[in-house]
Every structure is written in structure tokens, then in C-alpha cells.
Amino acid sequence: MSAFTPKYPISDEAMLDLLNKYPFLKFRKAYGSREPAYETDAENIENNYYKYWDGNGWEDLWKNRYIPRLFKLYDSWDDETKAKFEFMDVKEKYGELRIYTSVSTGEDSLNEIACDLSSWICADCGAEPREEGHRVIWTTGGWITNLCEECARKAIEKGVRTSFDDQLDAMKNVKTKPFGYTVYRLGQETKVIFKETEDGWLERDHVEQINKNNQTT
């Protein structure tokens, strides 16, 4: 959990309300345990999943896009499903935001969408650069981190990378294909294509079926 100053702070009173309404925001001593890691309200207000990415480039993605949709989905569940739900793990891996939960987010694909979007968001400042309408990002080698051009230049200047312009060009990635995923089953491909919403999330746009003869329907 980041100790940096949040871009989107929340009052202690509002945080406590969220913790009471959405208990999965509290840290647990161990996965599957109903015992909280912290005993007092003050400790839980300071240390919780809502504030997990405070000060990180993914804070907006986490607080303003992923979490509100998770709240809405959680509110739609029955009490039994709510009781089962918790975060199993939330972390950065290979430059992406990985979210593992005890209950699937189903067709909403919240965890997967957050992961896909995170790889095109600067992990340092939160910028989402585009060129000619396409998302673009600069990826470091070694410990993989996805950065905007400005933050990538700063990383190179700090000595994280040995060269400059050539290295910057080598780090650059441009997203030319839409977000989505493919399911393979019984010789047929099903492509689910997403479109971006006004608030920077993804939702299903259309589905393409590709049969054995490579024909799209």
C-alpha cells in the first residue's frame, strides 16, 4: 500500500461509512479469515483496500473507475455471495494491476478490465497518453513499468536506462487493436470486443464469431 499523498482523498467519516457498508475493503489477517488485520476504526480508516493505490498512477483507475463498479456489483448480490466476497490479492505484476477476488466478477469482467487498462496508464503520474487516437505507453525493461513519455525520460535521466533517445524509442508501444479477449471452443473463436466509456472504463461493444473456415459472423 502506498504511503504517498492521495490525489483523491476521502474524509475519515466517509471512509468509515464505506468500511461498514463494504467490509471487504478491510485488510484481513489471512485469506479466508474473517478476522480483521486491524482492531480499531482509526487503524482501519488508515489501512484498507480503498486507499491501496494512493499516490500511485493507478489511483484514479482504482478509486474512480474500478471500485465504484465493484460497489454496484456487490450491491446486486444476495447476502450469501456478499459474505463470500473478499480480495485474495491486489498487486502489481509485470507492469499491470492484478486483482484476485474470491468471487468472480462474471460478465462484468471488472478485474480483467482494470488489468488491461492499467498497462496503458502511467504507473507514476497516471497520464493516459495517446497519439492519433491510439493509446501509447513506454515500457521499461528489467522491472517492467509502464510510463508516459515524460516519466520515461525522467527514468532514463536517473540512470535507470543507459541510453536515451534509442532507448525511449525501444520502450514505446502503440495500441492499434481494440481492447477485448478471445475464447477458443470446439474449433470456433469468439472475440469479445470492448469500447471505451466516457469515464475511461471498458464495456462490451460487440462479439465476433470466427468458424473453422476463418469466416467472421
Task: Walk through the language-model features, giving the residues of each.
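Long, charged N-terminal interaction/targeting segments
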Residues: 1-108, 179-187
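Catalytic phosphate/metal-binding cores of nucleic-acid and nucleotide-processing enzymes, i.e., regions
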Residues: 81-83, 105-113, 135-139, 147
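Acidic, low-complexity, intrinsically disordered interaction modules
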Residues: 94-96, 174-204
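Short metal-coordination and nucleic-acid-contact micro-motifs, chiefly zinc-binding Cys/His arrays
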Residues: 117-121, 141-144
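Short cysteine-rich clusters marking metal-coordination/redox-active sites
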Residues: 122-125, 148
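Cysteine-rich micro-motifs
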Residues: 141-154
